[in-house]
Amino acid sequence: MKILGIDTSAKTSSVGICDDDKTVDELFLDKGLTHSETILPMIDEILTRNGLTLDDIDALAVNNGPGSFTGIRIGVAVVKGLAFEKNIPCYEVSTLDSIAYNCKDKSGLVVAVMDARRNQVYNANYQIIDGKAEKIKNDRSILIKDLYLEISEYDGDVFVIGDGQDKVKEFFEENNMTQDNFYYPDYYDNLQKGINTALIAYSSLKNKKCGEEILPLYLKLSQAEQELRKKRG
């Protein structure tokens, strides 16, 4: 079963193809371009260089959030359009699940974080069990100081990953919250990856949906919506 995974939920654009639980190919782009400019050409490229067309794809998977409001909308819209055109089933995957998948071969607590501004992060926590990231804290928006209070009590290794990693690390250092069991994996492990999205979808085939059922997961209002509510009192 070939699944095409798509991520536009943060700065990088990413696509990946798996065949059952095996990686076929993956592609990243981090050039400061908007996802609306990059994601469809990336899909064309990864299909072409593997001798495939959309007719060879059995399912689509997308990271539906949390993350960039605009990016999430673009990814979801692309998947909905392709699903409608080709009548392909879809899977929605939490962006935080996709990030945590990078640490499936480690042992300890995985703390997936994405920048949510104002000393907050989007976060979910995972325990690595038998090579799988088992979610123990569901997706949420949380103050970094409150996140610290949770993870500081953990005795084992703690891996802080995601595009909010630098923000969390800086906050911990400025507030004397660093601990010897906190680890900060490098750039590649901080990425939310289209191939992870595809592989996670394959592991949960019972959760398939049709295109119109795929919805963005925001967790909080956009900045514009927050400002509008303030003006309205």
Language model features with spans:
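Stable alpha-helical structural segments in soluble proteins, enriched in small hydrophobic residues
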Residues: I46-N50, E85, C103, G194-N207
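Surface "functional belts" at beta-alpha junctions
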Residues: K22, P89-N190
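Glycine-rich phosphate-binding loop signature in dinucleotide/nucleotide-binding domains
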Residues: N50-D55, K106-G108, S152-G156, L205-K208
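N-terminal beta-alpha supersecondary unit
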Residues: M1-P66, S141
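Acyltransferase
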Residues: P185-G233
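Residues at secondary-structure transition points
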Residues: D30-T38, F69-R73, A77, S94, ...
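DPxDG-like acidic metal-binding loop motif
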Residues: A59-C90, T95
